[in-house]
Regions:
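Active-site metal-binding loops of divalent metal-dependent hydrolases
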Residues: 32, 53, 75-77, 101
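Divalent metal-binding pocket/active-site signature
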Residues: 1-67, 85, 106-114, 129, ...
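Short amphipathic alpha-helices and their capping/turn segments at secondary-structure boundaries
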Residues: 82-92
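Active-site gating loops and adjacent loop-to-helix segments of metal-dependent hydrolytic enzymes
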Residues: 1-2, 99-102, 115-120
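Short acidic/histidine-rich active-site segments
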Residues: 93-112
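Active-site glycine- and acidic-residue-rich loops that bind
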Residues: 70-83
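Mid-to-C-terminal alpha-helical segments outside catalytic/metal-binding sites
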Residues: 19-20, 116-149
Length: 149
């Protein structure tokens, strides 16, 4: 919620979640809709952060990337002009893709994991790249952030 007492409570809980991720040396995955900058300000001391389902501003996205953090774009990039602008501006080496299933479908109806290919194709077109290049780099990024061998 957006009222001050609720935001303060959310910040206190978020600090606890940050501490858990830090103590376990795990990436912190943040869904910070309408609070991207405050969330970023709270995690700048961390090494591994993913901004899940990012929908914030370009300056905050750039600041997150400059901190080495990942920006994850959901399949709504296929139908949202704002998300297409984000896709154009995110650096490929800081990009992750996701569906956020069953939500944010690229078309009418329930979303599903296979739809991530729609995002990859569109992001490739926006960036003037081949879909295979976007798929390969986002797979590499995913393995890197989650320490998958």
């Amino acid at each position: 919620t957006k009222d001050a007492p609720s935001r303060e409570r959310q910040a206190e809980i978020f600090k606890k979640v940050i501490a858990i991720a830090e103590s376990l040396n795990l990436p912190l995955v943040i869904h910070s809709r309408d609070a991207e900058q405050p969330a970023l300000d709270m995690v700048k001391h961390l090494d591994k952060v993913v901004f899940h389902c990012y929908s914030g501003t370009l300056p905050t996205m750039k600041e997150a990337q400059d901190s080495g953090y990942y920006i994850s774009l959901a399949t709504n990039v296929c139908r949202s002009g704002h998300h297409q602008i984000l896709a154009r501006n995110v650096s490929l080496d800081h990009l992750l893709v996701e569906t956020d299933s069953p939500f944010l479908s690229p078309r009418k109806g329930r979303n599903e994991p296979a739809n991530v290919l729609d995002s990859v194709r569109l992001i490739a077109r926006i960036k003037g790249l081949e879909p295979q290049e976007v798929a390969a780099q986002t797979a590499t990024n995913t393995k890197r952030i989650y320490n998958i061998r």
